[in-house]
């Protein structure tokens, strides 16, 4: 109404988003008659009806139980894709960020540490904070010289990508799934 849109258009767009969110059957219920997930879907549908250029979602799933959070992640991701509205999604939940986002900005003390795709942030973190914030990792000290990385125990490996790297001490992030167990004497 405040946007000077006629009632028929409001009804049409409201129904469109209620259907998209799979909550048409709850359209006439009062908030106290809805579950937490239904309330979240209604709130999202209301926000989408006005066709914003950008949608800000600040911890939208923080008050939901674990099962409902997973379900709502899927609903939000599907809605983002089908509607095509740029969404800024604020969360402290790394799993939620990785599941919903096309691009992620990881912040520490109000300073952006890394912006990238979920895969980029996970596999090529810009610093130790980002590496340890997203997923599990092992941080080990090493030294790089002439394309060879040498660890504290003396183990070393030539890595082509390090051929042009300046000699320096480094910290390596090694994800648990990257470890391969071999029998003694095998490479």
Predicted ranges, named:
Residues 106, 126-127, 135, 139, ...:
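Short helix-capping and hinge/turn segments at secondary-structure transitions, especially at repeat
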Residues 1-129:
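ABC ATPase nucleotide-binding domains
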Residues 148-187:
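Glycine/charge-rich catalytic "coupling/switch" loops of P-loop NTPases
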Residues 123-145, 173:
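C-terminal boundary and immediately downstream tail of ABC-type ATPase nucleotide-binding domains
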Residues 27, 134-135, 160, 180:
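Generic, ordered loop/turn and secondary-structure boundary motif
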Residues 109, 144-146, 176:
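Residue-level signal for tight coil/turn positions that link beta-strands
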Residues 79-80, 141, 162-163:
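Short secondary-structure boundary/capping segments
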């Amino acid at each position: 109404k405040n946007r000077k849109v006629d009632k028929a258009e409001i009804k049409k767009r409201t129904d469109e988003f209620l259907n998209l969110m799979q909550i048409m059957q709850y359209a006439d219920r009062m908030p106290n008659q809805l579950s937490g997930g239904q309330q979240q879907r209604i709130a999202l549908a209301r926000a989408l009806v006005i066709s914003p250029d950008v949608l800000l979602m600040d911890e939208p799933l923080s008050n939901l139980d674990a099962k409902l959070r997973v379900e709502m992640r899927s609903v939000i991701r599907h809605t983002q894709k089908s509607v095509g509205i740029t969404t800024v999604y604020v969360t402290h939940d790394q799993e939620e960020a990785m599941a919903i986002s096309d691009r992620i900005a990881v912040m520490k003390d109000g300073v952006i540490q890394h912006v990238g795709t979920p895969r980029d942030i996970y596999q090529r973190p810009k610093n130790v904070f980002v590496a340890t914030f997203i997923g599990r990792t092992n941080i080990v000290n090493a030294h790089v010289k002439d394309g060879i990385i040498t660890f504290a125990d003396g183990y070393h490996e030539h890595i082509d990508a390090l051929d042009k790297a300046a000699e320096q001490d480094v910290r390596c992030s090694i994800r648990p799934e990257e470890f391969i167990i071999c029998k003694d004497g095998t490479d």
